[in-house]
Amino acid sequence: MSTFKNALPASNDILTRDPLPASHKTYISGEIHPEIKVPMRAITLTNGETVTVYDTSGPYTDPNIEIDVAQGIPTVRKDWIANRNDVEAYEGRIIDPKDNGYKNRTQMETAIAGASSLMRQPLRAKAGQNVTQLHYARQGIITPEMEFIAIRENQRRDMTRRYLNDPEREARLKGENFGANLLEDITPEFVRKEVAEGRAVIPANINHPESEPMIIGRNFLVKVNANIGNSATTSSIGEEVEKMVWATRWGADTVMDLSTGQNIHTTRDWILRNAPVPIGTVPIYQALEKVNGVAEDLTWEIFRDTLIEQAEQGVDYFTIHAGVLLRYVPMTAKRVTGIVSRGGSIMAKWCIAHHKENFLYTHFEDICEILKQYDVSFSLGDGLRPGSVADANDEAQISELKTLGELTQIAWKHDVQVIIEGPGHVPMHMIKENMDKQLEYCHEAPFYTLGPLTTDIAPGYDHITSGIGAAMIGWFGTAMLCYVTPKEHLGLPNRDDVKEGLITYKLAAHAADIAKGHPGARSRDDALSQARFEFRWEDQFNLGLDPEKARAFHDETLPRDSAKVAHFCSMCGPKFCSMKISQEVRDYADKQGLSTEDAVNKGMEEMSQTFKNQGSEVYVNVEDITKTGS
């Protein structure tokens, strides 16, 4: 058995810390709360301009911040939480060997030697207090988290308006928002109101002060989640920490730790103490480990203890499959792929074995009481989601969705934040129906979907089959997309798979923002298009979602530095580049003092005269053309 130390990075050097090309960190201060500093990524262009973009990478891309993974990253929210004076520190539960998948304490202590540096004394709400962002919002309080989010969502829109200053173009491209309320400028008050209404969620456990505030809601930028996690057969703790850092580098707005092997508790400690984004889990996975994988042996008491354990560590949202009811299980019998959710199948098996109602459903208000002590958000799991397009929108799926809507209102009664998980596998023509039903049944609580995959014929390419559905459902109103990697249905993703899945889903989310008409979403596109037209190759690479891949593809055929300033690429070559020809038309127009349209007409007249001078012959000798210079 390898020790805990051997499972961790030998040094901080293993973590990816370099800023992306031509990028540097910039920080914007608050006005209501001047102490806040909102990080963004500034991309410096070769023409002297700067494009500022949303940044999820935390301190890892700021070379001015020293990081020791054994101590964790800076706690940006620590003072905000303390200053509200509604939390208290307490001893917390004692770590049990079963928390880490071991049989006895000696075995566990040997395995996790050296882990104490990351253990924190947990906080909880003082007696009679509620510490959720939803509770504050309903009290009319604009928290530092809310102002932070407002600044972050605006992405220095004042600097990007130069790309959006053509009224005709903006009217033509305004988008279809399907009822979303997209403001020109996000204000802290708007953030507060959206959270108060339950239309948006700020996942922000008081025990995860390292997390930089973000928001999930359809009236904000579409977000992307990345799943990581070890298993009984693959991956070390160190690899999972680096995978989390790697995911945030490429745009993960949240990360779910789905670990199921040994050292689950300790892996989660290391991830949380080093995570600049909210972390989600599926607590039933760890609870199942505690009963040696026998679903029938699960109890409310074991699950409750697991919730408290993870809440004390700082998990920001829990996927809880409380909508898998006993009476819904038979509805899945005629499905092509049955129940494909791990959590859903665990609870279905428990219900059938005991012929009792799902204890997550019967104890739902007890769960609310726990979550509001720490501000853990519900992610109500779709345990009966379709696992194939053949099962999309069936009775089981829709019945569970209605139950999730009922549970949402119970959670809101306790001022606990809620997002709703969605499918799954859904053909394109049925995707909007999913979104419409979710808005209706779940009272506009944010929707969080896995894809959906639009076809089942492409193992190895499911990041694409699902990216299609993700872009569509994001446009229709989904607030957060759970990424799918090329390894979906085939195996656990590695580092490269994580990047591939994230780039695909950031693309889908961005396309959805543009289609919705989100103010400012298209400015980066216009900046890149302008760079492309002006043959600023380095700017094209650096403005893209993956500068490294774009540069590598270009250099496969034109590797020399001189090619980075060439007015052509290897696709068309120097003589057939459409953009070069367009530029020549514009240059000709400028030279002649004409508009582009007039220049084209004048050029046509000149060519017509040349045609007449050559005798109005359709076919002429090449040598004659050469002699006349035409």
From Swiss-Prot:
Q: Which residues form the signal peptide?
A: none
Q: Which domain of life is it from?
A: Bacteria
Reaction catalysed by this chain?
A: 5-amino-1-(5-phospho-beta-D-ribosyl)imidazole + S-adenosyl-L-methionine = 4-amino-2-methyl-5-(phosphooxymethyl)pyrimidine + CO + 5'-deoxyadenosine + formate + L-methionine + 3 H(+)
Query: Which residues bind substrate per the record?
Result: N227, M256, Y285, H321, S341, R342, G343, D382, G383, L384, R385, E421, Y448
Q: How is the cofactor bound?
A: Binds 1 [4Fe-4S] cluster per subunit. The cluster is coordinated with 3 cysteines and an exchangeable S-adenosyl-L-methionine.
Stated EC number for the protein is 4.1.99.17
Protein name, please?
Answer: Phosphomethylpyrimidine synthase
Task: Identify the species of origin.
Answer: Hydrogenovibrio crunogenus (strain DSM 25203 / XCL-2)
Q: Which gene encodes it?
A: thiC
